[in-house]
């Protein structure tokens, strides 16, 4: 019942540990407790002493556990996906020999529009696949969706074969290949398969003070399919009338045609077929204050009534508050 949660504002805590207890019958949240953090952003243990790292502006947006000893975190500020060791929970814990040759994938910031790069991660532990997708359209693929242009974001869903990546890293550790960071990064494309994903168009044409339209999270299902959270956040200058519209789609990329990173989008592009599971809208009005910006998803468990319980996390665009809520889907609806 311990979950790792990243913060897009912290330059000291790598992630926070939350104890989340859910009713096994109803799926309702019963208790949420922030246990603090054990690991710093530089990968060292938090010993409780004042500390300030040399690097700042990570803007960590997503986290997945990829093994018993490591996890991967997406940094929007650094345009990277990076593996970190899972450290002991206390300074008195026995020292363990951690893997040093950890994986990292960096992208050029020029590939993305501002604040529109890596927002999501999902890990399929059964097939050892690491999934991610840019939040919005890449620069080389066109303009991001806005209320004014009415475009549908065209994204590139990426599947990294984590099993093969780690197998290759183990060979490097044994001295069979060059283990330099630069060389290893160039080889990652050998283990990556990409797919074309098209979002829905903006639902409004009104002028916004803040507007965000993109995929805010992915979630890997046990059968190899994915849940995709499309999120549209609209905030006018006067704030009244702000809304956040979310749509949950189910896709099956493993049974779909791939789309190379070198290919250009066209009328013949094999976009992934998507099935709408549910959608909801929250907002801000004179009488109602329900605005909720959903940014994280994880599978909790199968409930006693055979429903699939999914935990979701929300945060404000200004970073002033973070809460956790839950939504449920019948297992038969996501198979």
Language model features with spans:
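Sequence/structural signature of beta-propeller domains
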Residues: 1-335
């Amino acid at each position: 019942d311990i979950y790792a949660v990243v913060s897009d504002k912290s330059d000291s805590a790598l992630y926070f540990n939350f104890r989340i207890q859910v009713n096994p019958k109803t799926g309702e949240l019963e208790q949420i407790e922030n246990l603090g953090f054990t690991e710093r952003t530089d990968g060292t243990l938090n010993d409780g002493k004042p500390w300030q790292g040399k690097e700042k502006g990570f803007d960590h947006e997503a986290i997945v556990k990829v093994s018993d000893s490591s996890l991967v975190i997406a940094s929007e500020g650094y345009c990277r996906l990076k593996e970190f060791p899972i450290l002991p929970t206390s300074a008195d814990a026995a020292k363990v020999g951690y893997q040093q040759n950890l994986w990292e994938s960096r992208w050029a910031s020029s590939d993305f529009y501002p604040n529109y790069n890596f927002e999501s991660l999902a890990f399929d532990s059964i097939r050892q696949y690491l999934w991610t997708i840019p939040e919005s359209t890449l620069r080389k693929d066109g303009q991001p969706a806005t209320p004014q242009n009415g475009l549908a974001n065209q994204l590139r869903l990426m599947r990294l074969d984590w099993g093969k990546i780690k197998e290759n890293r183990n060979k490097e550790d044994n001295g069979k290949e060059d283990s330099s960071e630069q060389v290893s990064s160039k080889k990652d494309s050998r283990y990556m398969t990409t797919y074309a994903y098209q979002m829905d168009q903006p639902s409004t044409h009104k002028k916004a003070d803040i507007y965000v339209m993109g995929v805010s999270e992915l979630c890997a299902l046990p059968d190899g399919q994915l849940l995709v959270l499309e999120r549209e956040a609209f905030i006018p200058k006067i704030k009244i009338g702000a809304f956040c519209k979310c749509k949950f789609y189910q896709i099956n990329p493993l049974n779909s045609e791939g789309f190379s990173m070198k290919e250009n989008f066209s009328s013949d592009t094999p976009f992934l077929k998507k099935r709408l599971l549910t959608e909801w809208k929250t907002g801000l009005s004179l009488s109602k204050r329900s605005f909720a910006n959903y940014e994280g998803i994880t599978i909790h468990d199968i409930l006693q009534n055979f429903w699939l319980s999914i935990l979701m996390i929300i945060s404000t665009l200004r970073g002033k508050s973070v809460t956790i809520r839950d939504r449920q889907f019948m297992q038969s609806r996501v198979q």
